[in-house]
């Protein structure tokens, strides 16, 4: 059994960092050590930024984006075409599409995809909010930009079925987004091309 070589505070930091997606125990130890070595330049400012984020971050009640204001900056941006809504699984997908810079539209974050095997149904996602937004009127196009996974495609078909009979054009990202691929991992050029070549469902 390995002996503990640090105090409980450092161990706690390592354990919490290891819960961050993309960081395992080994990477978390390296990150913690780097932060501690750069205590004044990194650890202190990071601690302050995390405290501020904890106090100020909100989930937009309209679209599900993460921001410090509600409604969020995207929803209140008068320069955006609010008649076009891009539907994404997660906030990271919204950020990825914004980096691509191909469209200046509104967004709607579902908070995941339908997955009966994992017990995730329509009521567990922000689908009702989307239907309500479209029901308010003024939406001419819905771009379904979910990942090209089985769950993503199931979600896209479910949304399309729910919107039958409404006067809104429903499109999806063009093929080219690889099957099984996730938007957050694609380069900006691929995302921009996929948005431009979207097709009607």
Curated annotation (Swiss-Prot):
PANTHER family according to UniProt: RECOMBINATION PROTEIN RECR
Cited HAMAP family: RecR (MF_00017)
Superkingdom classification of source: Bacteria
Family named by the database record: Belongs to the RecR family.
Function noted in UniProt: May play a role in DNA repair. It seems to be involved in an RecBC-independent recombinational process of DNA repair. It may act with RecF and RecO.
Protein name: Recombination protein RecR
Domain Toprim: 83-178
PROSITE patterns registered for this protein in UniProt: RECR (PS01300), TOPRIM (PS50880)
Keywords on record: DNA damage, DNA recombination, DNA repair, Metal-binding, Zinc, Zinc-finger
InterPro entries associated with the record: DNA_Rcmb_RecR, Rcmb_RecR, Rcmb_RecR_Znf, TOPRIM_dom, TOPRIM_RecR
Keyword Lipoprotein: no
Keyword set includes Methyltransferase: no
Zinc finger (C4-type): 60-75
Organism from which the protein derives: Rhizobium etli (strain CIAT 652)
GO annotation terms (biological process): DNA recombination; DNA repair
GO MF annotation: an example: zinc ion binding
């Amino acid at each position: 059994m390995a002996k503990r070589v640090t105090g409980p505070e450092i161990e706690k930091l390592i354990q919490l960092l290891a819960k961050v997606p993309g960081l395992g125990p080994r990477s978390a130890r390296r990150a913690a050590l780097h932060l501690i070595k750069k205590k004044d330049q990194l650890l202190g400012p990071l601690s302050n930024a995390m405290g501020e984020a904890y106090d100020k971050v909100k989930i937009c009640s309209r679209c599900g984006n993460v921001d410090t204001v509600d409604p969020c900056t995207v929803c209140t941006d008068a320069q955006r075409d609010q008649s076009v809504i891009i539907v994404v699984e997660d906030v990271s997908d919204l950020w990825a599409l914004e980096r691509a810079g191909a469209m200046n539209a509104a967004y709607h974050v579902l908070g995941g995809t339908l997955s009966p095997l994992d017990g995730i149904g329509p009521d567990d996602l922000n689908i009702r909010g989307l239907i309500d937004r479209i029901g308010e009127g003024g939406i001419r196009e819905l771009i379904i930009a979910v990942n090209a996974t089985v769950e993503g495609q199931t979600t896209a078909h479910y949304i399309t079925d729910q919107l039958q009979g409404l006067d809104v054009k429903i499109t999806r990202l063009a093929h080219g987004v690889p099957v099984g691929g996730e938007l957050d991992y694609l380069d900006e050029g691929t995302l921009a091309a996929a948005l431009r070549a979207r097709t009607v469902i």
